[in-house]
């Protein structure tokens, strides 16, 4: 009798417990920054989920951009450049730097952006401001990996 009761009650308890947890999406972007001395530049790679970026653009520009699809807006590249410029700021030796947009590519449901900064002097201090997607998601986390002068 106890065995039969357990077979009946245990699945019900499991369903109730598991259904009390709501699925929550993880909001994250990853930025990799590498100083390449022989090229005298800093190379920057940003990885951002396509749907998150589209939502940010829709909120900011009040229109659907349809990134990476056949419906992508003709000015999408300009919107991307402007968005990155507004949300990523880097200072080296206490001086703001110009970040040059190079290209983008798609990897699954992630957009990868490539940018660079030309460097002519030794890097003594490095500061970054990264506010990607923070205007859309309060839970947004922007992870930044930095490798400069062999310091991580």
Predicted ranges, named:
Residues 23-152:
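N-terminal soluble domains immediately following signal/targeting peptides that reside
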Residues 1-26:
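Bacterial Sec-dependent N-terminal signal peptides
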């Amino acid at each position: 009798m106890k065995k039969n009761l357990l077979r009946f009650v245990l699945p019900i308890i499991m369903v109730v417990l598991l259904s009390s947890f709501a699925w929550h999406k993880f909001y994250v972007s990853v930025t990799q920054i590498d100083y390449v001395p022989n090229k005298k530049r800093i190379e920057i790679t940003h990885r951002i989920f396509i749907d998150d970026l589209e939502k940010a653009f829709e909120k900011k520009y009040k229109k659907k951009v349809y990134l990476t699809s056949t419906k992508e807006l003709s000015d999408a590249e300009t919107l991307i450049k402007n968005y990155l410029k507004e949300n990523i700021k880097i200072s080296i030796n206490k001086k703001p730097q110009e970040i040059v947009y190079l290209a983008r590519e798609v990897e699954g449901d992630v957009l990868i952006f490539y940018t660079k900064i030309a460097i002519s002097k030794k890097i003594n201090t490095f500061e970054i401001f990264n506010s990607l997607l923070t205007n859309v998601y309060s839970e947004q986390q922007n992870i930044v990996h930095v490798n400069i002068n062999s310091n991580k």
